[in-house]
Amino acid sequence: MDAVWEARWTMATAEECRKALETLTGRLSEMGPEDRAAHLVDRDISCRVTDLGLTFLTRLGSGGAGPVTETTGGGPPAQVRFTTKSDDLLTIAADPGSFARAWLTGRLKIEASVFDLLRLRKLL
């Protein structure tokens, strides 16, 4: 088994997941303003963590990412929706190259328009 995907004995906490999402969105600040303007459009992004029963929400745009907040739902669905387990989320945040592998192996599900998927591909 690949060491990156080695199972943990306990699932991650809500706080660890929030920090992992902040790490992922923080990578956008490393992009230059021109790249952000070219590749990012204003989109609500949600990440549902199935084993914790939580959903986190942020907003991406040419200025970067907004704060990551826990949501109880009730609002309109985000334009880009990720679904994963807590430990897989931590792995994706720790290893930038694991995003595509997680998606290809079914550990990460993505619901988005074709347009948004193409933009995500350029970022990841």
Residue ranges and their predicted role:
Residues 1-124:
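Feature captures hydrophobic
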